[in-house]
């Protein structure tokens, strides 16, 4: 072979070995920061933790409801988000119920206001339906310009059931109260310090309790029985029934707030201090924990904390809130 040709061939082989045939790929790596958006938080009703539709326009309000023997069975309580129960004069229990998640067609019997019911409504910043009140309550309504929906001023928002004797026959409805709120331009945006997290009650250290009885006085006791994932309320041995819907109450949470209930200076009415702190219990999902409650002032909300100082979470759903004297007997099963 020609030496010149051979030299060229050798040089070509050497050069091809030094330059491997690698394809050059463009660098498509995107070095711009990745933005991760927070998940959209589901809107919920503030007093039950239930999901709220985007087009919900219901206005929250409260109603003072009688609980004497002549008033039972009451209407509308099965649809209340929260019912606060305590005593009035004569050892007779009375309720102030909060409505927002569900709006009943009939609510009552409506009765008169007391200062401690006003304080509950102030702490939640909500209007309340009632018919008259004690002298101290009516003075407080005027002095503090409270959102009173007094039947004595707004009779068109109420009616009498002639099948029952007065004063146990005064009723209202969500529709009538909502109309009155719109007329008075009371469009409160509800807020709540309550925390809802059902998983809180998965704690295996919480004590099980399927039945609790509160003896509020010699003539009245109430109890709560946990069955099939809900609490049913009993007065004495009778299951509590909603007259308007003919259903038993289905409750997710029971709160027991212990305070000192004393007789007023007039020796007729009672005083129930709700500002300060004290002990109590919360029941949910068939379990019970001791709690410490506190309230800073007239308009602040009541906080519920466990014995370690952590905020107590409620299960999603309705709550019955008992305000009792700390000497009342409480029996657990």
Language-model-detected regions and their locations in the chain:
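C-terminal motif of bacterial Sec signal peptides marking the signal peptidase cleavage site
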Residues: 14-17
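Positively charged n-region of N-terminal signal peptides that target proteins for export
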Residues: 1-4
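Hydrophobic alpha-helical targeting segments used for export or membrane insertion
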Residues: 9-11
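A surface/extracellular/periplasmic glyco- and lipid-processing/surface-interacting theme
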Residues: 24-82, 89-333
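Sequence-pattern detector for short linear motifs
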Residues: 6-7, 28
